[in-house]
Every structure is written in C-alpha cells, then in structure tokens.
C-alpha cells in the first residue's frame, strides 16, 4: 500500500477502493526509500524479528526500523531524538543507523518487499476457480500445476536456433521418452546454460507465456470460435452437446477476463510474482505478554519460512555453481509452496500447522470471512449512536413506528437530551445534565419524548441482502429491554420473533434524516423492489390470529335458528349433548354494545349474535329464499336467511336488518373501516 495512502484518501475524499494486481515496479516504488547517503532500503533480507539481547528489531529483518520506520516517534535505533515536523531539525535520517525521524504510525502502512530468487505464481490466480491463468492460456489446470511445481518442462519455442533437444527429437515422442532424459543434464555444471537455452519450467515458464499473450487477439479468436460453435447444429449426442456448451461458456469467460485486463491496464504476467510485498509490521505484530513471553502473528512465521527458503535458493544459484539441477528445481518448488502457504494456507491440500497442531492463519484468512479485515474493521465496524437488542412483536404499533426501550433510547439520544436540558435552563452544564440523566428524573423522559418526535431511527437486520434490510421508523418509548416491531414489516427484514436481533442507528445529518423520511420509512416500502409484489402481507401468527378472530361457532343457523322457543331444536341439542344448555342468541343494536358485552365477558369472541345493521341494501342483493318466515300479531314478520334476517312491516317495508355475526368479525370490520377512512382523509388532505 502506498505510504501516502491514508493522506491521499483524506485529501481527495475517495469513496471507493479497488484491489487488483500491480507491477513489480509499483511494489518496489511503494517499499523503497533512499537514505541521504544514497543507500536504498526496503528489501527484507533476513528472516529474523528482534534481537534477544537488546530487544531491538533486527537490521534488514521483518521489523527493521530502517525499512518500516521507528518504533517510537522521533527516536531512531541509536536512541537519538528529533522533533517531528520541525523543518529546522537536520538531518531527518540518523547517520549511524539510517532510521528516519518520523511518526511511528508510519509502521502501519509502510511496506517492504522480498526479492524472490525465482518467479512465483500467485496462488489465487492459479488455484482459485475459475483459474485466471488457465483461462488466459487455454490450457488444463493440471498441466499448469505440473509446470509450476517443476513436475515437467516445456521445450523453449522462443528461439529459432536448433537446440540439442530439438535435434535429438526428444520432444516429438511420448512424455516418457524425454521425461527421464532431461535429468541427465541436471548434474552437470552447465545446467544454467542448458536450462536457459533448452527448457522452460516453473513459474518462469508461466510468466513467459503470459508475457507473449496479445489480449486483443485472444478476444478476436475466442469470438470467432464462439460464433463457429454457435452455428453448429445439435448432434443429438447429449455428451457432445454438453461439451460444446461448456466450451462456449469457457470462451465467454476468457473474453470477459481479457477485456477486464485491458480495461484496468493490468498485464497478465503480473499474476506471477518477482517481488513479494511484506505487510507493515503493525498489521502483523509481536506482543509481549505476562512472564516475558512473546505472541507473534502467524504471518511472521510464514514470512520467515519464505525468506529462509528464498535465501537458500539464492545461495544455490550464486555460490554453488556445481549444484545439481534437481536440487535447484526442488528448492524452487519449496519457495513456491512457501509463498502459497503465506497467501492461502491449505489451498493445495493439507494446511501447514505449528508445533501445537494449530493451523497457521495465512493472508487469506486475515481478510476473508466475517472476522476478516474487511467485514470486521472496514465494512462492519462498530459505530457511534447505535444499539442492538432482541425484537418482539408490537401489535399495537403503527406500521411506521417501532418501540424503543428506555435504556437504549436514553443512550442514543443522550446528547440531544443534554442540549434540551441546557436550553430549557434545567441544567447549567453538561455535567449537571448527565447527572440528571443518571438519576432518571421525570423531566428527562419528557425531553426525550420531544427529541424522539423529530428524529427517525434506522433498524437493520443482518444480513442486509436488499434495500429493505434497513428501514426507517418513528421511535416510541416502551418498557422492557426489547425492540418492538410491527409484524407486517418482518418480511422485508426476513425476521421473525424467535430471538432475532436488530441494530438501531440514529441518522445525525440533515441529509440522512431527509433520506430516512422520504425514502426509507417502512410505510413507503410496501412493494418488493425485486418483483413489485406486496411485501407487507400477513403471515404466520397474523394469519392464525385472523382465522381465530373470524371463526365462529360451528353449530350454524340451521341447528339454532332465530326463535324464542324452538323446543324441537333444543330437545335435539339436549339429546346430542347432555351438558348442553340452550342459550338464545343475543341481539344488539350497535357494535359498541356487542364489544362492551364481550369485555364484560357476557359473550365469547366466537359467540354468534344478532347485530342491527344500517339500512344497506347491499346485504340483500342476492335473491335468496328465506329459510323461515315468522309472523307477529301486529302484522310485522321476520324473514330469516342464512346469516341475516329482515324485519318487514305490514306493507313489506324494511324496518330493521339484523346480521348474524361474532365479536371477532365486528372488530375486524371496524379496523378495516378505520383504515379506509384514514386513507380517505389522507387523500383529501393531499388534494
């Protein structure tokens, strides 16, 4: 990472960050520093961390102060001190140890590098599926793995001169004919000459092939092949048709990958490393615990392993010219495996473990997953003015309201309450206001109520998979320690009331509050953004509640007709059930009397009753034949239907209409009626 990366983000206010491959020159530029004496530092050459006698970082080691900066601000390795930021202080580097007089926070972003003795493929681009290297080269992954890990070699096609292997024709026959012939040259002193002229193996062979690629030609050829395959007719052979389909999918991926490299100005050979970046030491610390013992990040041990093997390979290539070629290639394979373990431990099979049989955490383990660098500290970090609690159902709440516990509300809105106390001259300063809040004086809750009326809150349930995973609500104070939520908004959150937790946030800026009110309120998000269907629909407990509310006694009107003394029916009831006691169905003039009787426990929720209805002809539009007709002495008569009866006068005029219903039906009807009237009032006020 660039040493000026943090200041660059602050200066330009960048809103995004892109991660990708970089060139060896860029890695060197990030890590290299030039001392006043002209010495260039930045390369980590030694696998050591601290000197045990002095407890100071080893020079050119993994914690070197010359490379990564001073441990203490303004103090070099010699102990000299300079004032940071004072331009009069000269020099800015210690002439003895070469440590720069700078803030120690530089050790959080100053990088180093390891100069690899042989090219090494980046295991993410080779082993992750789909393999980018295999896609670009259009070769089987197993073949490339065998080449990278020195299991076999390629004859160099780059030279037009007649080579020994080409003259002997060893590469024109089966693999067995040359697989055992090349090692005959490995024990000679001219192995380097032989290797540079005749064969290509290891990650260097991959790098050469990637460097020779022309991405535009790859796109053109892949497109032509894709069109040719599309013009072919189906053979009728399912296996062949699938094979053609897979090839077409591969060509599409290859073209997209080549376009991505062209669009981002990334060279394919950068997927093979020549310089290995070394993380800043503060990101892989060594901590001293009780008893003088040291705890080190696993990354340090993996870096040490890479440096040990790389230094061994360097010695074999430089000091011992008579080293057998098989030993050199074996050491190159060890370097490749060490870098693989550093980047992604276990990607090639059995992961590397320490002496306690614990798996080392590689670079991939540090950044991926829920506890990785991105999700834990960059994306999912804790923020101020937020809380978290279990959600419970709040059936009495409006759709756009949520119940906030007092304990959470007073913490979230504490600064606003303090300002309110001071403005109303109820507290002289912040300390007095906090004291009143701790003592939970009644005036505190009154001011809190006023503050909450003007501040929406945001509720979020992880994982936030779509925009309805976070919605705005108007908070109201509730007792207890759980957040109350209207059950109709649960589908958008994919939440239920079996122990789910939700986070609550307070939008502070004016822009955030406007966005919450205009776009994020729950009553404004009634449709699914994906398919447009209603998302605030009754489910689960609400459906059961509606069923119970609208269920009624199963006896039916035919078994208990409206009659003051139907002895035949009552005798039938008594014969069927000895415990049955006939009760005449009550009659009510309005719904308020019926609900009042239910609250007084004179009737049940599902008890059938007769309710006088307003003269609404819609209930008798069906030309239904009455079940019974009862005549009174005064000439009035009753027409009894399935669920209603009509009282008519002698002139056949309708006097009253009674409907047969239950208290549950009445309650549901009143709720629907109030909702319709509310929408009507809202519509009339808007117009």
Swiss-Prot record:
Its EC number is 2.7.7.6. Mg(2+) binds at residues 496, 498, 500. Zn(2+) binds at residues 76, 78, 94, 97. It is an enzyme of class 2 (transferase). It catalyses: RNA(n) + a ribonucleoside 5'-triphosphate = RNA(n+1) + diphosphate. GO terms for molecular function: DNA binding; DNA-directed RNA polymerase activity; magnesium ion binding; zinc ion binding. Gene3D superfamilies: 1.10.40.90, 2.40.40.20, RNA polymerase II, clamp domain, RNA polymerase Rpb1, domain 3. SUPFAM superfamilies: beta and beta-prime subunits of DNA dependent RNA-polymerase. It comes from the Eukaryota. This is DNA-directed RNA polymerase subunit beta'. The lineage of its organism: Eukaryota, Viridiplantae, Streptophyta, Embryophyta, Tracheophyta. Binds 1 Mg(2+) ion per subunit. It comes from Ipomoea purpurea (Common morning glory). The keyword Hydrolase does not apply. Disulfide bonds: none annotated. SMART domains: RPOLA_N. Its cofactor is Mg(2+); Zn(2+).
């Amino acid at each position: 990472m660039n040493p000026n990366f943090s200041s660059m983000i602050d200066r330009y206010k960048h809103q995004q960050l892109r991660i990708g491959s970089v060139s060896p020159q860029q890695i060197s530029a990030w890590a290299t520093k030039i001392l006043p004496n002209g010495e260039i530092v930045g390369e980590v050459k030694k696998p050591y961390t601290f000197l045990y006698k002095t407890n100071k970082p080893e020079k050119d080691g993994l914690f070197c102060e010359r490379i990564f900066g001073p441990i203490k601000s303004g103090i070099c390795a010699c102990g000299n001190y300079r004032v940071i930021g004072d331009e009069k202080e000269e020099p800015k580097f210690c002439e003895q140890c070469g440590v720069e007089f700078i803030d120690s926070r530089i050790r959080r972003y100053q990088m180093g590098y390891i100069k690899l003795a042989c090219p090494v493929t980046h295991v993410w681009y080779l082993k992750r599926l789909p393999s980018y290297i295999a896609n670009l080269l259009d070769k089987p992954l197993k073949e490339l793995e065998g080449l990278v890990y020195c299991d076999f070699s390629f004859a160099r096609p780059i030279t037009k001169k007649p080579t020994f292997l080409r003259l002997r024709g060893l590469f024109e026959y089966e693999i067995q004919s040359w697989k055992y012939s090349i090692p005959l040259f490995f024990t000679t002193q001219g192995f380097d000459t032989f290797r540079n002229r005749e064969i290509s193996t290891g990650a260097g062979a991959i790098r050469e092939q990637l460097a020779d690629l022309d991405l535009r030609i790859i796109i053109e050829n892949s497109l032509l092949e894709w069109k040719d395959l599309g013009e072919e007719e189906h053979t009728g052979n399912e296996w062949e048709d699938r094979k053609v389909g897979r090839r077409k999918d591969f060509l599409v991926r290859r073209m997209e990958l080549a376009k991505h490299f062209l669009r981002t100005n990334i060279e394919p050979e950068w997927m093979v490393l020549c310089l290995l970046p070394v993380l800043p030491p503060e990101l892989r610390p060594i901590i001293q615990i009780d008893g003088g013992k040291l705890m080190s990040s696993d990354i340090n041990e993996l870096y040490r392993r890479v440096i040990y093997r790389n230094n061994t390979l360097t010695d074999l290539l430089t000091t011992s010219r008579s080293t057998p070629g098989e030993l050199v290639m074996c050491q190159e394979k060890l370097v490749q495996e060490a870098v693989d373990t550093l980047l992604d431990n276990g990607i090639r099979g059995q992961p590397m473990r320490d002496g306690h049989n614990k798996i080392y955490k590689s670079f991939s383990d540090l950044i991926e997953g829920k506890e990785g660098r991105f999700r834990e500290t960059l994306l999912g970090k804790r923020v101020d003015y937020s809380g978290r609690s279990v959600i419970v159902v709040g059936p009495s709440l409006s759709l756009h309201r949520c119940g906030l516990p007092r304990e959470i509300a007073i913490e979230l809105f504490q600064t606003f309450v303090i300002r309110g106390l001071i403005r109303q001259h109820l507290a002289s300063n912040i300390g007095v206001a906090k004291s009143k809040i701790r003592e939970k004086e009644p005036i505190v809750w009154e001011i809190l109520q006023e503050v909450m009326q003007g501040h929406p809150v945001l509720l979020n349930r992880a994982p936030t998979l779509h925009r309805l995973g976070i919605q705005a609500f108007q908070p109201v104070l509730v007792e207890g320690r759980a957040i109350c939520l209207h059950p109709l908004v649960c589908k958008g959150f994919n939440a239920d009331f079996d122990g789910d937790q939700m986070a609550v946030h307070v939008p502070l800026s004016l822009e955030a509050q406007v966005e919450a009110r205009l776009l994020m309120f729950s009553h404004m998000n009634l449709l699914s953004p994906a398919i447009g269907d209603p998302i605030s629909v009754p489910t689960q407990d609400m459906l059961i509640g509606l069923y119970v509310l609208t269920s009624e006694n199963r006896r039916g009107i035919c078994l208990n007709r409206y009659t003051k003394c139907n002895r035949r029916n009552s005798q039938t009831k008594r014969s069927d059930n000895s415990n049955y006691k006939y009760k005449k169905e009550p009659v009510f003039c309005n719904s308020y009397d019926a609900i009042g009787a239910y609250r007084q426990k004179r009737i049940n929720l599902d008890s059938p009753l007769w309710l006088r209805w307003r003269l609404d002809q819609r209930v008798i539009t069906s030309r239904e034949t009455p079940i019974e007709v009862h005549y009174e002495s005064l000439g009035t008569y009753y027409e009894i239907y399935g669920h209603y009866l009509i009282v008519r006068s002698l002139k056949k005029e309708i006097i009253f209409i009674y409907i047969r219903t239950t208290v549950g039906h009445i309650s549901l009807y009143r709720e629907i009626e109030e909702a319709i009237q509310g929408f009507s009032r809202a519509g009339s006020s808007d117009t």
